[in-house]
Amino acid sequence: MEVTVLEVAPRDGLQNERAIVATADKIRLIERSVEAGLRRIEAVSFVNPQRVPQMADAEAVMAGVPRVPGVSYAGLVFNDRGLDRALATDVDEINVVVVATDTFSRRNQNCTTAEGVQRWSALARRAAASGVRRTVTIAAAFGCPFEGEVSAAAVLDLVRRVAAAEPDEIALADTIGVGTPDRVRTLVAGTAALVPGVPVRCHFHNTRNTGYANAVAALEAGAGILDASTGGVGGCPFAPAATGNIATEDLLYLLHRMDIGTGVRAEAVSATGTWLGEVLGSPVPALLGRAGGFPPARPGSQ
């Protein structure tokens, strides 16, 4: 079994950091990720810099990323202005977020869920016309910080609506880390049944220590792509307490011990997580860098 891990640390991982990370360090984070074997990277977001100052240098970051065959860089886009900026940087794919509840959608994007679907559809058409891959993420698919539980029926109805714009991929995001494996299986299997042939990706937070169990459940239910953030850094700036993306290195350890291939070197990602903690000025939440892999490498072994 092979799984694609989509690295989100450069965007989702850093966006909540109060201290602005130097552009050169953002580019180095991406370079190290590519060197470790990651082939899909969410590099930037093209959003209002007044709302997310950390992403104000999106164009400069994209200008400095290594262009390696087989590596795809994604940019988060909310509106036409963001898409204009993204297309000007030769981004490989755009990701658009549609939030599953009206309250969170208004807080995050200043629009209702229905308006978010309309925005996504318009952006998807423009991206397709420009030859850019387009993906859509349903945020708060497992629960909302303002409205509470979100029914599976409501999420799957939203899947049906966003699928009308023919996305290249649909993602389900546990934005505040409240999902559980049973719910993950229901939504992933339901999404796959509604959009056969469209890859399903999942984005989990480990806020309540369920992120890795949810990742395994997603794979069992048919998802083939998992988001993860080096060091376990990140979270949504518009969702209270939405900390703790699952850590790329910890996810890789789990997958590799289960004999699931990724093409990524966990030890290299772990070293990057340690380096990132030094850049940010505090240790990262990921555990592999502290505990080490298993079985331990023998002295002199390759």
Please annotate each region the language model reported.
Residues 1-302:
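Catalytic cores and adjacent flexible loops of soluble metabolic enzymes
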